[in-house]
């Protein structure tokens, strides 16, 4: 099957971030080009998640904004555990045993390394799947959904918890990295945020 050798960068933030844990050159070609965007997006979202996690220090891991909120470390743990469940139970990818998921020393950099390490084998797994696999309906908790739906639900779930952590960063008075565009802390030449009616009306 053919690929997309001349495609644009995965995201305009990715193109200015030169320290991506998963470089674009390591992303495999999808067996079905229609689903290349899913493989690209998964790699890009892992990179974005790592960039948010990296803004925390080890001293922040026990911090929470409210007694009923999760701590920073609880959210990092949940990401690793729940992503393994989505991929292993619902999408059928080969995954490590649950007892092997969490890093041994528990520092922020160790969590980031584990996030990227676990994501790596999922990329060729996703890239190898044919259309029938993506469209097949399988059990998902107490309902049934097609695998493409489950995959995108996983992406949204990760984005939800990543957004929680960007709020934590702001409350801790830390810089908030760019995710899908410039922030109050990160800007670059050529960035064009949509904060005006003029920008919203561009064609």
Can you annotate each of these PLM segments?
Residues 17-25, 39-43, 47-50, 60-101, ...:
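Short, contiguous alpha-helical
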Residues 88-129:
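Helix-adjacent hinge/juxtasegments
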Residues 53:
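His/Met- and acidic-residue-enriched segments that coordinate or traffic transition-metal cofactors
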Residues 11-12:
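Short, positively charged and aromatic/hydrophobic N-terminal segments
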Residues 126-141:
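Acidic catalytic patch
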Residues 38, 42, 108-119, 151-154:
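Hydrophobic packing residues in well-ordered alpha-helices of helical domains and bundles
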């Amino acid at each position: 099957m053919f690929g997309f050798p001349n495609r644009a960068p995965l995201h305009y933030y990715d193109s200015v971030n030169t320290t991506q844990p998963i470089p674009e050159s390591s992303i495999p070609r999808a067996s079905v080009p229609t689903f290349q965007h899913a493989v690209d997006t998964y790699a890009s979202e892992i990179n974005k998640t790592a960039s948010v996690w990296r803004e925390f220090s080890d001293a922040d891991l026990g911090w929470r904004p409210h007694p009923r909120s999760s701590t920073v470390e609880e959210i990092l743990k949940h990401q690793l555990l729940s992503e393994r469940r989505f991929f292993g139970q619902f999408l059928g990818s080969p995954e490590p045993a649950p007892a092997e998921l969490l890093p041994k020393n528990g520092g922020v950099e160790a969590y980031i390394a584990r996030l990227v390490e676990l994501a790596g084998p999922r990329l060729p797994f996703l890239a190898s799947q044919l259309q029938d696999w993506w469209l097949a309906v399988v059990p998902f908790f107490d309902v049934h959904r097609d695998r493409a739906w489950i995959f995108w639900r996983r992406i949204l779930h990760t984005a939800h918890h990543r957004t929680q952590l960007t709020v934590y960063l702001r409350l801790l008075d830390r810089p908030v990295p760019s995710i899908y565009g410039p922030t109050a802390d990160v800007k670059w030449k050529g960035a064009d945020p949509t904060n005006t009616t003029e920008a919203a009306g561009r064609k």
